A protein has these predicted regions:
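Sequence/structural signature of beta-propeller domains
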Residues: 1-234
Length: 234
């Protein structure tokens, strides 16, 4: 190997290379982990890997331009388990890109996206996915940029049961949506807007990374579609 592992410190400092030597699976740019509030599963975003030439079960698409999400479940739903199972929860992409190959299509139901990055499941079980595709980016189809295929980076709600995706908010030009925190009652979300371009957030001034606040005014949790007493919230 290009690294001499003489001590444990060598392995810790060069952990990626050490993992390769140990036979670890090379993943497609793992980014965020989140744990379901009932501790039943762990999810991991694999943002993309345009350089993948050989697929494997956990990274099933060569030239994986749009990424995927993995789900891990401990045997017997026990924190003491020594074994776990895993599945590909979702593959990102868009059927409109099928002309460029089946590896670009994905299996998202509803609002499609590329390059899942930020990931969190709130205490009521709502999964929130934040994206980080390059700008303008390569969609995989000649003449179509990622911006043209998917728009700006955004934040999505994804139903864990039917995998239906709904776009929640869209970031300004050039940004990555990353980071999510919330108040205990879930009526207020704090979302980070990182490295925007143009003149956001103040017109005519240099762009600045910022944290925005999203607040429900009817005392309901952000993402809850039901109003008190019936009817759907907007």
């Amino acid at each position: 190997t290009p690294v001499d592992f003489n001590t444990q410190a060598d392995a810790l400092i060069n952990c990626q290379r050490a993992a390769r030597v140990a036979g670890g699976t090379v993943m497609d740019r793992p980014e965020w982990l989140t744990v379901a509030p009932d501790n039943s599963a762990v999810f991991c975003t694999l943002t993309n890997n345009s350089g993948r030439g050989v697929a494997d079960p956990a990274n099933p698409r060569i030239r994986n331009l749009h990424g995927h999400i993995l789900k891990f479940s401990e045997e017997g739903n026990s924190p003491l388990a020594t074994k776990f199972s895993w599945e590909i929860f979702l593959t990102a992409g868009d059927p409109a890109l099928a002309a460029g190959g089946s590896n670009l299509v994905g299996d998202i139901e509803g609002d499609t996206f590329s390059s899942p990055d930020g990931l969190r499941i709130d205490p009521e079980g709502r999964m929130w996915v934040q994206t980080d595709h390059s700008v303008p980016g390569n969609s995989g189809v000649d003449g179509t940029t990622i911006d043209q295929a998917f728009g700006h980076n955004a934040m999505f709600y994804v139903d864990q049961q039917n995998k239906q995706s709904k776009r929640f908010l869209v970031g300004p030009l050039g940004c990555e949506i990353t980071g999510l925190a919330y108040t205990p009652d879930l009526t207020t979300f704090f979302v980070n807007i990182q490295h925007p371009t143009g003149d956001w957030p103040v017109a005519g001034e240099a762009p600045r990374s910022s944290t925005i606040v999203v607040r429900r005014t009817d005392s309901q949790p952000v993402g809850n579609c039901q109003r008190p007493g019936g009817g759907r919230a907007r």
